[in-house]
Design a protein with these regions (language model features):
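Secreted glycan hydrolases and related glycan-binding modules that recognize and/or cleave
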Residues: 1-151
Length: 151
């Protein structure tokens, strides 16, 4: 993908209509998300993309570093075409945080397959709760650091 000049051109042109560059006043826009192997694309396209979706299939540590983008724009995902019955590594991905900052979120390919679990969407519900908890913990640490008296 990194050598795909046509894809890079397409995403930049799409930003005339959708994506972050289509909304210079910040009034709201339709998002552009790129899902897949994002290495090599992030440097040239980061300002044109709202979220990068990394396929962390089967990985308990999705790794947010090394892409050259702010981790808050990265959503890590598990493969529920394969792991819907046991959740795979989704809960560990939900708990994972980058070294600096926070992640954009967590998700799953074919999370509709989680519907048949008991309760419905068993793994996705837990992942959302875990993701929210670790974000709130991160935010509390940020607030604590900001309110700490300077010596």
């Amino acid at each position: 993908l990194s050598q795909n000049k046509h894809l890079i051109h397409l995403v930049k042109e799409m930003n005339n209509y959708i994506g972050p560059k289509s909304d210079p006043e910040g009034k709201g826009h339709k998002m552009i998300c790129i899902d897949g192997n994002i290495y090599g694309l992030t440097h040239e396209l980061d300002e044109y993309v709202d979220y990068w979706i990394i396929q962390s299939y089967g990985s308990s540590n999705p790794g947010f570093d090394g892409y050259g983008v702010d981790p808050k724009k990265i959503i890590c995902t598990e493969n529920f075409e394969k792991y819907a019955t046991n959740g795979g590594q989704l809960l560990k991905q939900a708990a994972a945080m980058p070294r600096e900052g926070y992640k954009g979120g967590v998700g799953a390919y074919r999370f509709d397959n989680d519907y048949d679990n008991t309760p419905n969407y068993k793994w996705m519900r837990q992942a959302i709760q875990i993701n929210q908890r670790v974000f709130n913990e991160w935010k509390a640490k940020q607030n604590e650091a900001e309110n700490k008296p300077q010596k």
